[in-house]
Amino acid sequence: MEIIIGLLIIAVGAFCQSSSYVPINKIKQWSWESYWLIQGVFAWLVFPIAGAMLAVPEGHSLWELYAAYPKESVLTALFGILWGVGGLTFGLSMRYLGVALGQSLALGTCAGLGTILTPLFLGRPGDLTASVVIGVVVTLVGIAIIGLAGHMKSQSLSEEQKRAAVKDFNFTKGISVALLAGFMSACFNIGLGFGEPLNFGDATADIYKTLPATFMVTLGGFLTNATYCLYQNFRNKSFGDYSNSSLWANNLLFCALAGVLWYSQFFGLSLGKGFLTDSESLMTFSWCILMALNVVFSNVWGIILKEWRGCSSRTVAVLISGIVVLIISSFLPEILK
């Protein structure tokens, strides 16, 4: 029963993450670099540090925790900086491919590499049991099926239909950016692996134990994204976006909403893993579960946002079959163990 609860919590977080780009459409008259930076303040600083505080028992502090593990804290943040590159290109992948296909390809690469590389970096190859590896393979198969549906979509739609669904649609450029985003985004889970000691042991509840490490990763990612966004503000002379006070109430609200929805995936991952401690295979596979469910829900949003409008019934059938495979992959390691 606890395993089911854990998986459901992760699923809720995945749904929230996949919904996080919807509020961005409500942001008015701001350039990409301006709204990306402001939503990042919420997604990578405000809410992660609030979450990390839940792991701190009374009489202690986060600074005390990080000071006690300086090497682990630095490594976690460094992988966060690398993940930040993935975060930047992740946004571009959706710009060129749309929410459904862009998230699918980037998260697929991220799911596979994040799950496989983390135990190897930590010197624990034994964590990669046969059931975990099979689960990763099935996940990648599901994402490949969705990628095939995306390719079928690109072949069947006219240029006008492509632009109507995704304004800057560019399949070739989008594929390249999405694969890079996935590779660099896998560093998030590697960072979480190095940050495993960042908690107060038995004084921290299992459901909160990864949250201090999550904050260090997002802090590193914020540094990368903030540097790039401020550079783009300077280059594009878009600093004026921040001075238009008439837009602040609306844009701040939707940036904050996007930020809390985005962070929910890692808050949910931490809570969910707290219920999976009896299953070593699912603990190792939890990253892949989160990414797979992100893909599932991102494609649900893609359908809702009519990104698949005009596609043949065959293309939609391929898409749905890929979603079904991903759902099955989420609990496959537990069945096979």
Describe every region a protein language model picked out:
Residues 1-337:
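Polytopic alpha-helical membrane proteins, predominantly small-molecule transporters/carriers
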